Every structure is written in structure tokens, then in C-alpha cells.
């Protein structure tokens, strides 16, 4: 049984916990502790009730400083300094670092010094970590000596499996990406101050361009794609699910049917459970709570002049990513034990 702790219990932290119980991986992973500065009553309430993902079916209770989920007891901590967390006493194997604020190796090593054996960051990180993993593509690079690993981003997990498939079958010369991302909690409900002037504006009233490092994230997973991609991102007034508009120029000449067939076969084969394919006339809310990293919308595939291909990809940017956190942590333990 892998003993884990969650540091930072926001959207991703709570999704990880709920996904653990819904995915059937509870027999392999035990959440021992949650470190979150919010009040325990709010922690328990937001675990039980969620606007996006609905009510959590197991009954959740607060007893003293512990959250009870069925027979499971989870210690609630409120320690702002990771170096002071009791990971050694709790025998923590992996910390899910989900604050969004601790993103480099030096900061994450505070968890290691506190006694945790490994750290998995729920965010793109600095280049000094032991590895950045997109599960399904490069988890085989994990080694026993790796202690600090990044799970990349939800959009990197969405797009990299598709690029990998296209490149292996047709060769990818270059690409351009537009991420159409749901609003996030770094935006404002009504106009208010923010360092990014666009994010001073009300999230529910505008389509808001934001910076993205997605193209650089692709390069980290697929180094041979260096300088081949550029990306922009906009936030839209929805609370969950992201669409990615991917345009790629291929080495080979293709048609719509060929591209869709290759992607559907990959979804049913090597990337089963990671990549999906649909030809139904669906909209974003239909992918809410979908555990896959990426779903190709075959109805929107377009080909121009035989080599310019445009695809529409969907992902639940919370739930899919949370499930990959679980998968990657299991792969980290497997590598450590090999």
C-alpha cells in the first residue's frame, strides 16, 4: 500500500482524492494526510459537495483534526512550511504537491527533508526536477533514484499523446495550438486587481487571453519537437472542460478518414484509457468528469492540401489530470521497486 499526502487541497487536490475512490485505486494508494491552510469544516464540506463534479458518494465526517471517509482516517494539517510537516513520522511514500506554488526542485526537497520519499508536482515545473511525465507517453523514463517529478499540465497531457501518434504515423513538421480553457481560480468574479491586466476582468463576462508555456511543455516530453510548435491560450466563461484546437503540418499526405482511423485505433490500443475518440455531436459539458487525458472529436477533423491537419481535442482539465496523478505515482513506485 502506497502512503501518500496531499499538500494543497484545492481543485486538483480534491479531485485527486475523489478520483482515488472512484477509480478503484484505493486498494493500492492510501491518503494519510492533507496539508491545507483552510478551515477543517471547509475542507470536509468541499470534499463532500462539489459544484463541478457533484456529491461525493462516500460519507465524509470531521472528527477533531481528522477527516473520515468510511473507515479511512485522514489527518488534516495546517502547516505553511513544508519542511516542518510530519512526513517521516507518517511514513509518507509520495507527496502530491498541489499548491501550485512549489514548482522547483529546491522547494520540493523540503518535503524530502521532512521525510517523504518522493514528490509528484501537479503542475509544470522547473527543468531541474528528475523528470516531467505525461502518462502513456514517457513514464518508462522513471527511475528508482527519481525523487522529484512533475506531472506536466492538463493541456500537455491532452495534446502530447495525439502529437505522438501523428508523428509516429505521418511525421510532424510543425504545429500551432489554441487552448480554449475554462476559467480558473486565479481570475476574478468581478473586476479586481491582478498583476496580469487581462485577469483583472470578470471571468464570467469575457473570453480572456492568457500566457501559456504549452509549446515548451511539448518539447520537454518530445525533445525532437523543439521549436516546431507555438501556442496561445484563452479562458472562457465555463467552470470546467477544455478544448484544444491543434493544427499540424505533416510529412505525409493524408485525408480525414485516414487521420481519424489512426487516432481511433490508438485510443483503442496503446492509449486505451488515456486517449479517447468520438464521432458524436457532443459539447464541452459532455466531457465533464471524463477520466481520460484527451478525447479526439472526429467530427471536427479537417485536412487542407493533404498535409495541413486541424483537430479538436477535449479534456476535463481537472478530472483527467487528477487520474493521471494517480497513474504517475503508481509508476513512480513501480520504478523505485524495480
Curated annotation (Swiss-Prot):
Keywords: Cytoplasm, NAD, Oxidoreductase, Pyridoxine biosynthesis. InterPro entries: E4P_DH_bac (IPR006422), GlycerAld/Erythrose_P_DH (IPR020831), GlycerAld_3-P_DH_AS (IPR020830), GlycerAld_3-P_DH_cat (IPR020829), GlycerAld_3-P_DH_NAD(P)-bd (IPR020828), NAD(P)-bd_dom_sf (IPR036291). One of its GO terms (molecular function) is erythrose-4-phosphate dehydrogenase activity. Its EC number is 1.2.1.72. The record marks 181 as: Activates thiol group during catalysis. Pathway: Cofactor biosynthesis; pyridoxine 5'-phosphate biosynthesis; pyridoxine 5'-phosphate from D-erythrose 4-phosphate: step 1/5. NAD(+) binds at residues 11-12, 317. It catalyses: D-erythrose 4-phosphate + NAD(+) + H2O = 4-phospho-D-erythronate + NADH + 2 H(+). SUPFAM superfamilies: Glyceraldehyde-3-phosphate dehydrogenase-like, C-terminal domain, NAD(P)-binding Rossmann-fold domains. PROSITE patterns: GAPDH. It is found in: Cytoplasm. It holds the Pfam family Gp_dh_N. Its main location: cytoplasm. The keyword Cytoplasm applies. Belongs to the glyceraldehyde-3-phosphate dehydrogenase family. Epd subfamily. Catalyzes the NAD-dependent conversion of D-erythrose 4-phosphate to 4-phosphoerythronate. PANTHER family: GLYCERALDEHYDE-3-PHOSPHATE DEHYDROGENASE 2. This is D-erythrose-4-phosphate dehydrogenase. It comes from Shewanella sp. (strain MR-7). The gene is epd.
